[in-house]
Amino acid sequence: MNDRNADLEAVINEYSDMLYKICFVILKNEHDTKDVLQDTFMIYYTKRPDFESEEHKKAWLIRVSQNKCKEFLRFHKRHAAVPLEKIDETELITDGLNEYERETLSMIWDMNLKLKSVVVLHYIVGYSVDETADILKISSSAVKKRLQRAREALKSEYKGGLVYEK
């Protein structure tokens, strides 16, 4: 196996789970998520970018995968197809979650992409506010504001009918 193939295999092993979670939350579909991940790794393989650090590589992969998700959503919005059957693929990612966690995840999926991106990177993947800002190429204050708006949206959803107390 040559060095490029070994590098690609190492990148896939290292980052595929994290990128899958990010893309699945955006696309809400296992098959589309896998397509976007394949495109992301092909871009990595063909461009062979140089990175200053592993964090830079990770941020680049997240950025490319998010851009591919946006591109995918734009394309399918313009070229809407009628699904043959509606399959609830959320079961794949929500297996093992309690009802409150499933409802919260469902509400996150329904957020606009700007809010959803910061919520996924900060709360699900675990990046700090500054790291999230670097990845999304926005200011830290913009990340904080979007997180605040996302929390407010979740609170208002819970007040609108869902009641949960720990």
Language-model-detected regions and their locations in the chain:
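Structural recognition of an alpha-helix C-terminal capping motif at a helix-to-coil junction
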Residues: 21, 35-42, 55-67
